[in-house]
Swiss-Prot record:
It comes from the Bacteria. Belongs to the UPF0352 family. InterPro entries: UPF0352, YejL_sf. This is UPF0352 protein Swoo_2786. Gene3D superfamilies: YejL-like (1.10.3390.10). It comes from Shewanella woodyi (strain ATCC 51908 / MS32).
């Protein structure tokens, strides 16, 4: 069963394109891109998710990421 998102594909793809353009501008190799994006996720969790929910949200995020790369 597909997961329904409250965000449109257009909105998501637009943000991805902008983030990718910034990484391209800096000629960031794959490992640096992953490091930067991971640090962004960590910062977002620290600033926007209550402390008591962070571990759970991080776990859900990591599971979704792992599932998305399985194809």
């Amino acid at each position: 069963m597909a997961i329904q998102s409250k965000y449109s594909n257009t909105q998501v793809e637009s943000i991805i394109a902008e983030l990718s353009a910034v990484l391209d501008k800096h000629q960031a190799p794959t490992d640096l891109r992953l490091m930067v994006l991971g640090n962004c996720v960590t910062d977002l969790l620290a600033r926007k998710v209550p402390a008591e929910a962070r571990a759970s949200v991080a776990e859900q995020f990591s599971k979704a990421l792992a599932q998305s790369v399985k194809g």
